[in-house]
């Protein structure tokens, strides 16, 4: 549905040249929810704005629904953009218009008959859960309700693609979850292809089928969500995954934690489990094989793309030789082990 090939985007600021995107290629199949994740300034917003040519690429090809957009005339591009809805971090609603009026606007601009506008807007407001807000004004809506209006407006022309530019960044966690569930429901009901950009791996984990990691204008990793969470290939992907599972060292342990081993001290370990290593009884196996005991301090598990993954803080009791052998064995069995210190 969306095919970006060798996209490069260069901005000129006076005598300074800024390369925002460098040879980016991305394919989003029809009906998928595809996430692009990266830090601020990585090129995410530039990339998504190239899809509907709000930013025209310096080089490369943009195809949506099999149509090459970069060669279209202005009138042809305007028509093609009706098949591409877009929502933003800030809702961009017209304060002087009601909820109904905001959603109706693109249909009015397209000279849609009034009866058809009424039918379509009513249908969309019911879809996004705002069937009772026809006559409300944006000032009287919560942030989540405003974003629902923006989603309804983006769907007014019955697009095949929805672009989401940090659509939940301005929302609280509970509202974020409700908006993501709405997007997932719309994708399922309408078969809508969704491309979203975010800096939060929680967003990707919750609704995406596939994910690409962008850094300094380049896609450095892309795969299914389950594969990236199970076998991240880049340090940046690992960092984003770690951000979804975070365990703080308890204060009493922090007070006792030493950088080097002392008499009778034991290593404190941070273990990350993904894929098959989550369900395998690896800790009990290390106890049998190496005569070590693991005291679990805290642990957290989660799911992404149907794959379970988790993190654990433990004390490993045993001799230095036994604990080193146990750690090496765990690493051989796809557990990431970090020695945080000694307690």
Curated annotation (Swiss-Prot):
Enzyme Commission code(s) on record = 7.4.2.11
Annotated catalysed reactions: L-methionine(out) + ATP + H2O = L-methionine(in) + ADP + phosphate + H(+); D-methionine(out) + ATP + H2O = D-methionine(in) + ADP + phosphate + H(+)
Question: Where does the source fall among the domains of life?
Answer: Bacteria
What keywords are assigned to this protein? Answer: Amino-acid transport, ATP-binding, Cell inner membrane, Cell membrane, Membrane, Nucleotide-binding, Translocase, Transport
Domain (ABC transporter) spans 2-241
Query: Which ranges does the record mark as transmembrane?
Result: none
Which enzyme type, at the first EC level? translocase
GO terms, molecular function: ABC-type D-methionine transporter activity; ATP binding; ATP hydrolysis activity
Q: Give the residues the record marks as binding ATP.
A: 38-45
The record, for SMART domains, names: AAA, NIL
Q: Which InterPro entries match?
A: AAA+_ATPase, ABC_MetN_proteobac, ABC_transporter-like_ATP-bd, ABC_transporter-like_CS, ACT-like_dom_sf, MetN_ABC, MetN_ABC_transporter-like, NIL_domain
Q: Name one Pfam family in it.
A: NIL
Q: Give the protein's biological function.
A: Part of the ABC transporter complex MetNIQ involved in methionine import. Responsible for energy coupling to the transport system.
Q: Spell out the family assignment given in the record's similarity comment.
A: Belongs to the ABC transporter superfamily. Methionine importer (TC 3.A.1.24) family.
How does the annotation summarize its subunit structure? The complex is composed of two ATP-binding proteins (MetN), two transmembrane proteins (MetI) and a solute-binding protein (MetQ).
Q: What is this protein called?
A: Methionine import ATP-binding protein MetN 1
């Amino acid at each position: 549905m969306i095919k970006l090939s060798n996209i490069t985007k260069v901005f000129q600021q006076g005598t300074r040249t800024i390369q925002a995107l460098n040879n980016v290629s991305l394919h989003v199949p029809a009906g998928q929810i595809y996430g692009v994740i990266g830090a601020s300034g990585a090129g995410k917003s530039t990339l998504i704005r190239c899809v509907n040519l709000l930013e025209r690429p310096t080089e490369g090809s943009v195809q949506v629904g099999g149509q090459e957009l970069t060669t279209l005339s202005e009138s042809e591009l305007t028509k093609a953009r009706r098949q591409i809805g877009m929502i933003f971090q800030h809702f961009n609603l017209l304060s002087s218009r009601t909820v109904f009026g905001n959603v109706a606007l693109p249909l009015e601009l397209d000279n849609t008959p009034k009866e058809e506008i009424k039918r379509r807007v009513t249908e969309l407001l019911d879809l996004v859960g705002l069937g009772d807000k026809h006559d409300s004004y944006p000032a009287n809506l919560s942030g989540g309700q405003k974003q629902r209006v923006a989603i309804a407006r983006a769907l007014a022309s019955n697009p095949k693609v929805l672009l989401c530019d940090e659509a939940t960044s301005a929302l609280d966690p509970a509202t974020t979850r409700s908006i993501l569930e709405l997007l997932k429901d719309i994708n399922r009901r309408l078969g809508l292809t969704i491309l979203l950009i975010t800096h939060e791996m929680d967003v990707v984990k919750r609704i995406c089928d596939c994910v690409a990691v962008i850094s300094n204008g380049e896609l450095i990793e892309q795969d299914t969500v389950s594969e990236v969470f199970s076998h991240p290939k880049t340090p940046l992907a690992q960092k984003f995954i770690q951000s979804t599972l975070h365990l703080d060292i308890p204060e009493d342990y922090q007070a006792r934690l030493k950088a080097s081993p002392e008499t009778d001290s034991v290593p404190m370990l941070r273990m990350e489990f993904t894929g098959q290593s989550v369900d395998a009884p690896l800790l009990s196996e290390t106890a049998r094989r190496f005569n070590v005991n693991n005291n679990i301090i805290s642990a957290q598990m989660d799911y992404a793309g149907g794959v379970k993954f988790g993190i654990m803080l433990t004390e490993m009791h045993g001799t230095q030789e036994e604990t080193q052998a146990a750690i090496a064995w765990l690493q051989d069995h796809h557990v990431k082990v970090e020695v945080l210190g000694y307690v």
